[in-house]
UniProtKB/Swiss-Prot annotation:
Classification via InterPro entries: Mediator_Med24
Gene field: med24
Family: Belongs to the Mediator complex subunit 24 family.
Protein's UniProt name: Putative mediator of RNA polymerase II transcription subunit 24
Composition bias type Basic residues, residue spans: 944-964
Ranges in coiled-coil conformation: 505-584, 943-977, 1915-1968
Compositional bias per record (Low complexity), positions renumbered to this chain: 212-229, 273-291, 300-311, 387-451, 501-539, 547-580, 754-770, 788-808, 928-943, 965-999, 1017-1118, 1385-1419, 1565-1584, 1594-1608
One GO BP: positive regulation of transcription initiation by RNA polymerase II
Length: 2036
């Protein structure tokens, strides 16, 4: 009850306050009070009423609310402003007195700036131009005083405020005038006057209008008045502090003195600014006060204007705020009405205000009622308003003269208040102490009074959030209002022009009719005269009749002329009225442009509007975008009008007056002004409002990096380093897949949240003003600098357009929805069954988009690095792609065509460049390049249009024949006219056809501005681009809606529809011209004279000439369009420039044609443009086009495997693979192998659809590993080829392949025959158990490929980046499995995660808890632990610490192994034992311990050599993956079994054709282990053509090697050494492996299995084991670099083997004799000074060698490299040395790429702080920041920020260091070097953050915004379902006799309900089969995204630290750079310091 009473009282209080304020304002206006008097009366009256109300409330209520009385007594500034604006809007012009009240209220901060902006937006009518002009003046002054507070000090101060001469006013306001006598107007005088007036008031709230007096004035006031002489007023600055406070005087209850001691309560207004004004504090004697009470108004001239000189000269009415005498009644009394409205009327003003807003056309009173009182006002915008200039500061002499004149005037005006400008010196002092920004604060005398601690500490997060939103909303509404003013002017101008055109057409028709009548009369007169002369020459009556006819004719002519004159006069009057209205609107629009230009030049204002795009996604921001787009449309229309009529008017024979009138109608003065002066304003606002991409700051580093004075090498090096590492490096190419940031596409979210259907849009652009129809912002992100909005889509009848604003952070809805997104989610309608199905369909669509977004997992890291460098260097898209493609072609020219580097570079060029280009198009929203044109359909449309025109000609001819038959008297004349009409129609139809052809070409070649950029938001604004094309502006968006993914075939019908629509538009235009010509001809045909017919012929000829001229002009415009498109289409332009290089002709393969072919098939290029650019490829392009339009049907089958020509073949291959699923028959191995050999050939040899084929292979769904073991074995056999691995590496599928292999090995390796037979009933029979007997067989092939990838090719053990990626992927997979696993398995998996995350040395703890019972429970632990131990190279334990030795794995396994023989029975027993007891992972993880025990027994002479070889043979024979483990163990151990004497060894290489076996041993000193190890080369076996280690019968024809002497040799390496005692056992082991391979006993099949397989299929089955031999060879040869090179074959297989070669290459001898410091200097100097592109592999070799010489000390090598780079920085002069940037990029690559991520903490936290004192110039600071940036980019730091706490802490320390440095710079002294270093580093981090994370990875699967909303929808659906079920149960209970029934009946009904529900669920699953799975998927995605979310680089800091850093940036730079560090713009609402 109390709360209800409180709400009711507050509502009543607000209503009463509003009425009180309105009453006080009206009474003040009637009494003609000055603003100061009005403010006193306002406060007194408002406070008295509130005190009375408060006393009544206190008597009724408790005393708990006493503390809130003062807060409730304050005046609501918004209500006050709204009342003033309402009252100002009454009448023909606003009352100047009310204007002065409003200005004064703003000046004393009674109305805040934010409140004023919002109130003006709500309560101002643009249509009432005279009223709104005054508001614009106030807005201009407000913006000026915020922007330049020191230059605009007296804008709001009411100077020379005169008192009324009326005695009534003097009698009523004596006390007020006495208080105003003192010019200083001290607070004490105010309080005394208030005390005299209101002696019973406890506390009187007033506002301190001016600053407190100076000490001298305060002391003088205390002395006697007689001792004081009147002094001239001294200027005293008034500073409105930040925060600005409204002061309230409160009585101190403790005071007992009669003079009430007042306290001031200060409350901050929401918007804090800094404004300074001046006040004069002087005192006068009592005699002067009494005389001045009767003094008159200030002196005026004859016109009633004041003679005072101010910065803004206005009349007395405008300045003083006093209406003229016409508004007063008799004897000077105020009239009872205020501009026709009684001041005592109710609150109907607001209703009238709403009616005024609805009226868009001026009333007669408004149009004619020019303000008489403001007509003499001299505006500051009076430069004829064509080129308004900003306010200029006057010279010191002029200021002194003005001050002297003002002082002389003020001596005669002591009764008025005068505020003067300070002197120039004081202005300069103020400029030094304060900055023109919103955040600076200055001291003010207002804050001399004390403030209570309670009011100061009220600022909380809620208030700051409200303040933040309030500021953003106020500035967006201000900009919206200003754009609406300009839009309204264009609308009115079009309306007036249309009226004038219609009037002119009517006048012309009337004139033509009158002329025709006159001509008829004259002809009749001539005929009568001729008859009278011939026949009746002597008859006087006839003569009299002829004279009467002449008189009648003359009278008719005179009447017609009089009518024409009257019409012309009426039209002139209307035109004058319209012109007057238009002139006022023009002035208002120019004022709006001036205010917008101030906003645009101020970074703070502009940033507040920019931030509103993230906060106000729909309602408020939509109102700002729509008028801006409407203005751009009108600008475009004016451009069209400016270009078109020049040809028509010149060619046509028009009179001079008509030409001038038409030209004035077409040329808009505001458009000319915008084109001349405000072009950059619209470009900048377009970038802020419409761009999806966030605008990134580009500081001085941009001009440094891509300066014109530098050579091309400085740009090339960084790109070349990254591309070379991508092609030749052995690192995983896609790393950010799991850590992708949560960004949602706006297009995706629209389809979910917009549950209602979008309405069709109208064709008219004017409809976009009300509801936004017809405008699409989604694709307008071209970054064009042109003035015309050529990229704005005009809605057609069949297009559903919606506006998408800023797809980066927050998703947008369509503009048709008026409610914001949150309210729409909360107010979802109750889901009826059709709505639920619609929702589910939307969810399914979104999940399809999520799955399609997974294609971004194949995006390489190099693309993000290149994008970062692109934005930093400021390269355009053409320059960016041209640089990359040029580097790739240069590599192709230098490489050998038979080398692996050439093949991989070619693959990268053909597939990754189109992939990158498609990503650029899709993610930046520029769909203009997706030109999926169909020339055949376009030609069909042309033919249809031509047929229609021919039909029209036939119809015209038939009509003309009918006209001939009807007119028998004038056959000849009519025939001539008809012929002319036919000629006209034929010519016009030809023009139609020509225009259709031209439009078809322009639609194919969409315009993209040359300066436009897809990938970069460049700040290079080209203001000189004034020329725009007219045809392309209407045809440039034909294909904007056709953004297509790489993986899908596009729909070409959309393009055809868009082309036909544009052609129809052109036809309509030409048809209108034809209709006009035909109408003129029909009017002229009504005349029956020969002269008129001749005139018609002339007119028709002129029309023909006009149409021909139009044709020529259209052709010329289309030629210009072609020229523009040459520069606009990015990839076409790049290929054209690349084709000009003559060195490309040396390349054997025509790579340009291959690239063009792939781009065409991916629908990324314009076919017609390519034909014009490459005429040599015209036939090839036509054939490709025809193949795309009519693709051949696929005829592929298992018996017909030839080539892949189309996507249909890819689909057919997918079907063939799916047909092989779930087929375990071993006889199908030949079919599988044949199909995958065919696939293998297409993976090795590139073709057009290679990426599609890989997508099919890696994105196959619903494959069960257990039921498809044979198929997976065949696939992994194909993937084991090194050339296939190269292809997979280029396309970015390697990391995914590794994870698939881990999943396969886990499923195969964790099962045994015992577990499978117990769990699955199918395998109980012996016939079905053959697969389970060969578990090791299926495990071997994927395990072999996994081992090869991880250990050999990608060297995970020595590559930290690959190691960390695998670890993160393993932890991610375990987290996913733990969510779906039971609680028992959860405990075991979590232990393994903890082991990995803790990185503990678990060397001796692997077998501590090994029991026989844990084999079935801890399989996953063994799998993860073995992978981790294998990666970390931990030592293997030998079973020590096991409690029960008899149950350990080693004991049981060795016992069975030693007890078994090589006989059939013993092998069978061992097979059954091992497969029953041990899984594959058990053997893999524990076999090294077994080997250790075997060789340890051999060393102790416990067993003999024969037993060792026997056990090895048994292992090799049945466990096929054991050789990998055995030889890996042999290469790492120190057993005496391998120790040989260090005797000299000789190596010979021979070529043989027979099978020989040689035993080789050699010694190597491995730098990795620093021990002498023994390895053996493989036995010499015959090699097939692909070089694999095969048996004599096997061969593979899919690959070929280089031929020597025309034959394919088989290479055998024979390494002979001195025999020793211990060579024999090793030789026996190798011989055992060789014999097993030769005799096909490497894997022993069971008899039952052999009985199922035929001979041919058995051979194919054995071939699957060929890659195992190669893996063993690589294990044996990889440490032996020399022998590896002598083999030659393996180095030619893949570029991934290059890393193995580089690890053991010997460095040059020069470096071995140098110190490490000199060696590093030598390496860097040689690299920089080489003219040819250097070899990066040699650089890597040299750096690793130097690092090894430093004993792998990380700190030393980082210090040496950094010192060398810093020496280069200090040696660089101000003009930039030639290799300065090149050296920075090289140093960053050495530290980040070669040394690694570990170098960054040393560089950022140690070296840079110590060397910062040496950075003295700005160039040094820029170079140092770029060096840090290059190190971070090359080290993949973005990944480690997510995973490594050490890297996070180092970056956090570095940011805090930058913050402290910037603070110290401000406090101590500015240092140019450190300032530029700090700002450049921050800017580069912003570019790195946006280019690498937010821009491209928001489409990833971890899409939190999308998934959160889907999750909310699903949860609501589930809750609604539960509610419905509860309702049904309640209804059933109510129906069943009040719920009384037996237990048995309840039980039966429950069972029946369950059955019914089960049946319904099954039916729903049939209808919607995947809905429940979709819900589970979304939930898991939701949990995953909440678990791990990617943060930006700056989000390592907390919100407070971020805010502190942004404040430091703001003090050194601008506001825009300060807020750019916030990745999530919602965090800005918690930053109170930034917005205070």
């Amino acid at each position: 009850m109390i709360s209800m009473m409180e709400t009711s009282t507050t509502e009543k209080k607000s209503n009463t306050d509003n009425s009180i304020l309105k009453k006080i304002i009206i009474d003040s206006w009637r009494q003609r009070l000055s603003p100061i008097e009005w403010s006193l009366k306002l406060y007194n009256g408002f406070y008295n009423n509130n005190n009375n109300n408060n006393s009544n409330n206190n008597n009724n209520n408790n005393n708990n609310n006493n503390n809130n009385n003062v807060d409730n007594n304050e005046i609501n500034s918004i209500e006050l402003c709204e009342i003033l604006l309402d009252l100002m809007n009454i009448g023909q012009s606003p009352s100047p007195l009310l204007v002065s009240y409003l200005r004064y209220a703003i000046s004393i901060k009674l109305i805040g700036y934010n409140e004023f902006f919002e109130s003006v937006y709500k309560f101002s009518s643009i249509s009432r131009a005279q009223h709104f002009s005054v508001i614009l003046d106030i807005l201009f002054d407000v913006i000026n005083i915020i922007n330049y507070p020191s230059h605009h000090q007296n804008i709001f101060n009411s100077d020379n405020i005169e008192n009324s001469n009326n005695n009534n006013n003097n009698n009523n306001n004596n006390n007020n005038n006495n208080s105003n006598n003192n010019i200083g107007f001290k607070v004490s005088s105010l309080s005394s006057s208030l005390k005299r007036n209101n002696s019973k008031i406890i506390s009187t709230p007033i506002v301190t209008l001016l600053s407190s007096p100076s000490p001298s004035s305060s002391s003088s006031s205390s002395t006697s008045p007689s001792s004081q002489q009147p002094q001239p007023p001294q200027p005293q600055p008034l500073s409105y502090t930040s925060p600005i406070k409204k002061t309230v005087l409160i009585k101190n209850p403790d005071s007992t003195d009669s003079d009430e001691i007042m306290k001031v309560k200060e409350e901050p207004i929401k918007f804090k600014t800094t404004t300074t004004t001046t006040s004069t504090t002087t005192t006068t004697s009592t005699t002067s006060t009494t005389t001045n009470e009767i003094s008159s108004s200030p002196p005026t001239n004859g016109n009633g204007e004041e003679t005072t000189i101010t910065t803004k000269t206005e009349d007395s009415n405008g300045i003083n705020g006093i209406d003229s005498e016409d508004h007063k009644g008799e004897n000077g009394k105020a009239s009872p009405q205020m501009n026709g409205v009684h001041p005592g009327s109710d609150g109907n003003i607001s209703h009238k205000r709403k009616e005024m807003d609805s009226n868009t056309i001026f009333d007669d009173d408004d149009s004619n009622g020019v303000d008489q009182h403001c007509s003499n006002k001299k505006m500051k915008h009076t430069d004829t308003l064509t080129q308004p200039q900003p306010k200029q500061i006057q010279n010191p002499q002029q200021q002194e003269q003005q001050q002297q004149q003002q002082e002389n005037i003020e001596q005669n005006q002591h009764g008025n208040l005068h505020l003067h400008q300070p002197s120039q010196q004081q202005q300069q002092q103020q400029q030094q102490t304060s900055q023109p920004s919103l955040t600076t604060t200055t001291a003010s005398a207002v804050t001399q009074t004390t403030t209570t601690a309670s009011t100061i500490n009220k600022s909380t997060k809620a208030t700051t959030k409200k303040n933040y939103h309030k500021q953003l909303l106020s500035f967006t509404r201000l900009a919206t209002l200003l754009f609406k003013v300009i839009e309204y002017y264009f609308q009115e101008d079009e309306r007036i022009n249309n009226i004038n055109k219609s009037v002119n057409n009517n006048n012309n028709n009337n004139n033509n009719n009158n002329n025709n009548n006159n001509n008829n009369n004259n002809n009749n007169y001539n005929n009568n005269n001729n008859d009278s002369m011939d026949q009746n020459s002597n008859n006087p009556a006839v003569k009299y009749n002829s004279n009467n006819n002449n008189i009648n004719n003359n009278n008719n002519n005179n009447n017609n002329n009089n009518n024409n004159n009257n019409n012309n006069n009426n039209n002139n009057n209307n035109n004058n009225n319209n012109n007057n209205i238009n002139n006022i609107l023009y002035k208002n629009s120019v004022k709006s442009l001036e205010i917008l230009s101030i906003i645009q030049n101020n970074s703070t204002f502009k940033t507040l509007i920019y931030l509103a795009k993230y906060e106000f996604t729909l309602s408020s921001f939509k109102d700002l975008v729509l008028p801006f787009l409407a203005i751009q449309n009108s600008i475009r229309d004016n451009i069209v009008k400016q270009n078109i009529p020049s040809t028509q008017l010149i060619s046509s024979q028009v009179k001079g007056q008509e030409f001038a009138s038409q030209q004035t109608q077409l040329l808009n003065p505001l458009f000319q002004l915008i084109k001349q002066k405000y072009q950059k304003l619209f470009i900048d606002f377009r970038r802020i409002l419409i761009n999806k991409q966030e605008i990134l700051p580009n500081h001085d580093i941009g001009s440094l990096v891509h300066g014109s004075s530098q050579s091309d090498k400085q740009i090339i090096l960084s790109f070349e380093i990254i591309i070379d590492q991508e092609i030749n490096g052995n690192h995983f190419k896609s790393s950010h897949t799991k850590l992708a940031i949560s960004r949602g596409k706006p297009n995706e979210l629209d389809t979910i949240l917009n549950l209602k259907n979008n309405k069709n849009n109208n064709n008219n652009n004017n409809n976009s003003n009300g509801n936004g129809n017809g405008i699409d912002i989604g694709s307008s992100t071209d970054g064009s600098n042109k003035l015309s909005s050529t990229n704005i889509e005009e809605g057609n009848n069949n297009n559903n357009s919606s506006t998408h604003l800023n797809g980066n952070d927050q998703s947008q809805q369509s503009l048709d929805d008026e409610e914001p997104k949150q309210s729409q989610q909360q107010q979802l309608p109750p889901p009826s069954p059709p709505q639920q199905s619609h929702q589910k369909i939307q969810i399914q669509k979104q999940l399809q988009l999520i799955r399609q977004a997974k294609n971004l997992e194949n995006v390489s890291d190099c693309f993000f690095k290149l994008l970062t460098l692109k934005t930093v260097k400021g390269l355009s898209d053409v320059e960016f792609l041209l640089e990359i493609v040029k580097i790739l072609f240069q590599k192709l020219v230098r490489c050998n065509p038979n080398s692996n580097e050439y093949k991989k570079t070619r693959l990268f060029l053909l597939f990754k460049i189109p992939h990158f280009y498609s990503l650029m198009i899709d993610n930046y929203g520029n769909n203009n390049n997706n030109n999926n044109t169909n020339t055949n359909n376009i030609n069909n449309n042309k033919n249809k249009n031509s047929k229609k025109s021919n039909n029209k000609n036939k119809n015209n001819k038939n009509n003309n024949k009918k006209n001939k038959n009807n007119n028998n008297n004038n056959n000849n004349n009519n025939n001539n006219n008809n012929n002319n009409n036919n000629n006209n129609n034929n010519n016009n139809n030809n023009n139609n056809n020509n225009n259709n052809n031209n439009n078809g070409e322009s639609s194919d070649k969409n315009e993209i501005n040359p300066e436009g950029s897809i990938g970069s938001n460049n700040n290079n604004d080209n203001d000189n681009n004034d020329e725009t094309n007219t045809n392309t502006s209407s045809n440039n968006n034909n294909n904007n809606n056709n953004s297509n993914d790489n993986e899908n075939v596009t729909d070409n019908n959309k393009n055809n529809n868009s082309n036909t629509k544009n052609n129809n538009n052109s036809n309509n235009n030409n048809n209108n011209n034809n209709n006009n010509n035909n109408n003129n001809n029909n009017n002229n045909n009504n005349n029956n004279n020969n002269n008129n017919n001749n005139n018609n012929n002339n007119n028709n000829n002129n029309n023909n000439n006009n149409n021909n001229n139009n044709n020529n002009n259209n052709n010329n415009n289309n030629k210009k369009n072609k020229d523009l498109n040459l520069h606009g289409n990015i990839i076409e332009n790049v290929l054209y420039q690349i084709n000009q290089f003559p060195s490309l002709y040396n390349v054997e393969d025509n790579i340009i044609l291959s690239l063009i072919q792939i781009l065409i098939k991916k629908h990324l290029v314009d076919i017609n443009l390519l034909k014009s650019l490459f005429p040599n490829y015209h036939t090839d392009i036509d054939s490709i086009d025809s193949e795309i339009q009519s693709p051949p049907s696929s005829e592929l089958s298992f018996d017909n495997l030839f080539d892949i020509h189309s996507i249909a073949d890819i689909v057919k291959i997918k079907e063939l693979i799916e047909s092989l699923l779930n087929n375990s028959d071993p006889n199908n191995v030949s079919i599988m192998k044949r199909l995958f050999d065919f696939i293998k050939n297409h993976l090795i040899n590139s073709f057009d659809y290679q990426d599609k084929l890989l997508n099919v292979l890696f994105n196959a769904k619903n494959i069960d590993y257990d039921s498809n073991k044979l198929l997976i074995a065949v696939i992994m056999y194909i993937f084991s080829d090194p050339l296939v691995i190269d292809t997979i590496d280029v396309h970015g599928y390697t990391l995914r392949l590794v994870m698939i292999l881990i999943d396969v090995c886990e499923s195969y390796g964790s099962s045994t025959t015992a577990t499978t037979t117990e769990d699955i009933d199918i395998f109980k029979n012996e016939n079905d158990n053959h697969d389970q007997k060969h578990l090791y067989f299926y495990f071997t092939i994927p395990f072999n490929l996994l081992y090869t990838l991880l250990i050999i090719l990608y060297d995970v053990k020595n590559n930290k980046y690959n190691l960390d990626l695998i670890k993160s992927k393993l932890s991610e997979s375990l987290n996913n499995k733990n969510n779906s696993r039971k609680s028992k398995s959860n405990n075991s998996s979590n232990n393994s995660i903890n082991n990995i995350n803790n990185n503990n040395n678990n060397n001796n703890n692997n077998n501590n808890n090994n029991n026989n019972n844990n084999n079935n429970n801890n399989n996953n632990n063994n799998f993860i632990q073995w992978i981790y131990n294998m990666i970390k190279d931990t030592n293997f334990s030998n079973g020590n610490g096991v409690n029960n030795v008899s149950t350990s794995f080693e004991f049981q396994f060795l016992k069975n192994l030693f007890d078994s023989d090589l006989g059939e029975d013993s092998i069978e027993k061992f097979q059954n034992f091992s497969q029953r007891e041990y899984s594959s992972w058990d053997i893999v993880s524990k076999l090294p311990n077994v080997l250790y025990n075997i060789f340890d027994c051999y060393d102790r002479n416990i067993i003999q050599e024969e037993k060792v070889t026997q056990t090895m043979q048994l292992l090799f024979q049945y466990i096929p993956f054991s050789p990998i483990i055995v030889f890996d163990y042999l290469s790492k151990t120190k057993s005496s079994f391998f120790n040989v004497s260090p005797s000299s060894s000789t190596t010979t290489t021979t070529t043989t054709t027979s099978t020989t076996t040689t035993i080789t041993t050699t010694t190597t000193n491995s730098s990795a282990y620093s021990t002498t190890t023994t390895t053996s080369a493989s036995t010499s076996l015959p090699k097939s053509t692909d070089g694999k280690l095969l048996n004599g019968k096997s061969s593979n024809t899919s690959t070929t090697t280089t031929k020597n002497n025309g034959d394919t040799p088989t290479i055998t390496t024979v390494i002979t050494t001195m025999s020793s005692k211990n060579d024999k056992p090793l030789s026996l082991v190798e011989a055992c492996l060789t014999n097993l391979n030769e005799n096909r006993l490497l894997f022993r099949l069971s008899d039952y299995y052999k009985s199922l397989i035929s001979e041919d299929h058995l051979n194919d089955l054995y071939k699957l084991f060929d890659p195992i031999s190669e893996t063993i060879n690589l294990l044996l040869l990889s440490p032996k670099l020399q022998k590896f090179n002598e083999l030659g074959y393996y180095s030619n297989q893949s570029t991934l083997f290059n890393s193995i070669c580089l690890t053991n290459l010997s460095p040059p001898n020069q470096l071995s004799n140098m110190t490490p410091a000199n060696a590093i200097r030598q390496v860097i100097d040689q690299f920089l000074t080489k003219s040819v592109s250097p070899n990066l592999s040699n650089l890597e070799r040299d750096i690793k060698y130097i690092h090894m010489r430093l004993s792998n000390d990380l700190c030393q090598i980082v210090n040496l490299v950094s010192l060398e780079i810093l020496d280069i920085i200090l040696q660089s002069c101000q003009i930039e040395s030639l290799y300065s940037i090149r050296a920075m990029e090289l140093g960053g690559y050495i530290l980040g790429g070669l040394i690694g991520i570990e170098s960054l903490p040393i560089l950022l936290n140690s070296i840079i702080p110590s060397w910062s004192e040496h950075i003295q110039t700005s160039l040094h600071g820029q170079l140092l920041s770029y060096f840090c940036f290059s190190s971070i980019v090359n080290s993949n730091a973005l990944y480690y920020i997510q995973t490594d706490l050490c890297i996070q802490q180092s970056f956090k320390k570095f940011f805090l260091l930058l913050n402290d440095t910037m603070k110290r710079i401000l406090s101590v002294a500015p240092l140019n070097g450190l300032i530029t270093f700090c700002l450049s580093t921050i800017t580069l981090f912003i570019h790195l953050n946006h280019s690498s994370i937010t821009t491209y990875l928001y489409n990833s699967s971890s899409n939190t915004q999308l998934i959160n909303q889907l999750y909310e929808i699903i949860s609501k659906n589930q809750s609604l379902k539960k509610k419905q079920k509860l309702k049904q149960k309640k209804q059933q209970h109510n129906n069943n006799n009040g719920g009384e029934y037996n237990i048995d009946q309840d039980h039966i009904e429950q069972i029946q309900q369950q059955q019914q529900q089960y049946q319904k669920q099954q039916q729903q699953r049939k209808d919607e089969p995947n809905y429940e799975k979709l819900e589970e998927f979304i939930k898991t995605q939701y949990q995953r995204n909440n678990h791990s979310k990617l943060k930006s680089i700056f989000n390592i800091l907390s919100i407070s630290q971020l805010e502190d850093l942004s404040m430091s940036i703001l003090n050194l730079s601008n506001f825009f750079l300060a807020i750019s560090i916030f990745e999530d713009k919602n965090d800005l609402q918690y930053c109170s310091k930034l917005f205070n």
